[in-house]
Amino acid sequence: MAVYAIGDIQGCWREFKALLKKLRLKDSDELWLAGDLINRGPDSLKVLRKLRAMDQQVHIVLGNHDLHFLAIVFGGHNAGAKDTFAELLGADDVEDLANWLRKQKLLHRNYGHVMTHAGLPGC
């Protein structure tokens, strides 16, 4: 079993897909994702759909871009001029994806390691 930690995919589907191909994940491998899965890049929708399909193999902590998206969907916030959520917000499955995303953690701990998107006090 291998554990791979990746941060800040930021909607870059093509690059993420290429990385997954290089990793050649086995069923027993784990993918730890340190937040900012979406926004900035052009393909946030593809990234979220892929990660949701890999749900049993990935451990995700939310980053500020992910939380910003959830605030737009559930909290009445507006997307900013630089946000690249348009395709995602218009998707038929946006609520399902947002509900799945909001169940992810802010911190993941396993194998004697802790993963967050940002730092921890005292570290």
Predicted segments, located by residue:
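N-terminal active-site segment of His-dependent metallophosphoesterases
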Residues: 1-50, 54
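Active-site neighborhood of divalent metal-dependent phosphoester bond hydrolases
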Residues: 45-123
